Each structure stands twice: as structure tokens, then as C-alpha cells.
A protein has these predicted regions:
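Glycine-rich, proline-tolerant flexible connector loops at the mouths of alpha/beta enzymes
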Residues: 1, 55-69
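Alpha/beta catalytic cores of nucleotide-metabolism and tRNA/nucleoside-modifying enzymes
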Residues: 2, 6-9, 14-16, 27-29, ...
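Structural beta-sheet core signal
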Residues: 21-22, 93
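A short alpha-helix capping/helix-coil boundary motif
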Residues: 16-21, 58-60, 81-82
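Short, structured patches in soluble enzyme cores that scaffold and shape functional sites
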Residues: 23-25, 52-57
Length: 185
């Protein structure tokens, strides 16, 4: 906790932007709630503005990063307890949120929900989130509209020596489940 707190202090002293820390609920055998809460309190006292808590522990001895995203069990209850003990802190939860409904339900217990891979893998599934969470009545764009709107950006990237694939590879999932998706890919 002391090293991380020192980093947070340095960041806070060198910029005016909010500082967020993303962390797991534990590492290897160091996964007691007491240690987690102590870590968060220590870092909060150093000035962290927001905590994004991944609801899994990290197993550094024996699991690779990909395995660490699926094998350690999600423990939402641990993050919920952390928030209850620290209501003054901005705490958002991360890990395993793959639907808008599941995310909205979590907002009842946390200050936010971080959505990661699900948005990248299934972006159109998330196109109604602003409407469902904030009541903003926006019409979701079609994948083709999004892709065509990026052409000037891709052209600029290419004029600076980049390859179109640098950007296009991240658009493949936009066409998931639509007719003739293979043509777009």
C-alpha cells in the first residue's frame, strides 16, 4: 500500500486531473478483506479520487493474464462490503459485466460499473445503454454509419504512415450478427 500511495501522491501533486486506481480484491494468498480495506484506505488517504475494483483476485503464481480473467471466481460481495464500509469513497465495480441489465442492477450498490471486454466484443449490444441508464433517447447508429464515419480518420492515420488494419481490426465486432457480416469483415 505504501508504494502505491506514494505514486498517488506524486500524481496528485503533479496534475489537476482526478486520479483513479484500478485494482483486484487480492493477490495470490494475500486476499483477506482486512488487507483489501487497508490498501484502499491507505491509497484514499494519499488522494485517490476513484477506485475501480476488479471483483477477482489475481493469481500471479501459476496463471497467465488470460486465465486470470476467468479462473479466479468473481466475488461481488467483497466489493459490496468494501463500498458499505467506505461510503464516502467513489467505488466502481469491474469484472464479468456482460449485459446492460446486469450493469444497471450493480449501480444500486456502486458508484459505477466498468465494462471491459464485453463492449469491445459486442459493441452493438451496448448501443442502448445511455437510453436505459440516463433516459437519453438516442437512436443507435447502424454499424455501416459508424464504419463510414471513420473513413477520414483512417485516411489521416494512413497519411501519417499507419496501416488501415491498425484501426479496422477493432471494427470487426461491429458487424457481429448482422446480415452479410462476412462481406463487411
Amino acid at each position: 500500500p505504501a508504494k502505491v500511495a506514494k505514486c498517488i501522491e506524486s500524481l496528485k501533486n503533479s496534475c489537476s486531473l482526478p486520479v483513479t486506481i484500478k485494482h483486484r480484491i487480492g493477490v495470490d494468498e494475500d486476499d483477506s478483506f482486512r488487507n483489501l480495506n487497508n490498501f484502499v484506505r491507505h491509497v484514499a488517504n494519499a488522494g485517490a479520487d476513484r477506485f475501480t475494483v476488479h471483483a477477482r483476485k489475481a493469481i500471479l503464481k501459476g496463471l497467465n493474464p488470460k486465465q486470470n480473467r476467468t479462473i479466479p471466481p468473481l466475488k461481488y460481495d467483497v466489493v459490496k462490503k468494501l463500498k458499505k464500509l467506505n461510503p464516502e469513497l467513489l467505488i466502481e465495480i469491474n469484472g464479468g459485466f456482460n449485459s446492460i441489465d446486469k450493469s444497471i442492477k450493480a449501480l444500486g450498490d456502486f458508484d459505477g460499473v466498468m465494462i471491459g471486454r464485453s463492449v469491445y466484443k459486442h459493441p452493438l449490444r451496448w448501443s442502448e445503454i445511455d437510453q436505459k441508464v440516463y433516459g437519453i433517447n438516442t437512436k443507435p447508429k447502424f454499424a455501416s454509419e459508424i464504419i463510414f464515419s471513420l473513413i477520414p480518420y483512417i485516411e489521416k492515420h494512413m497519411s501519417n504512415g499507419g496501416k488501415s488494419w491498425d484501426i479496422c481490426k477493432h471494427l470487426i465486432n461491429l458487424v457481429e450478427g448482422i446480415p452479410k457480416a462476412k462481406i463487411w469483415r
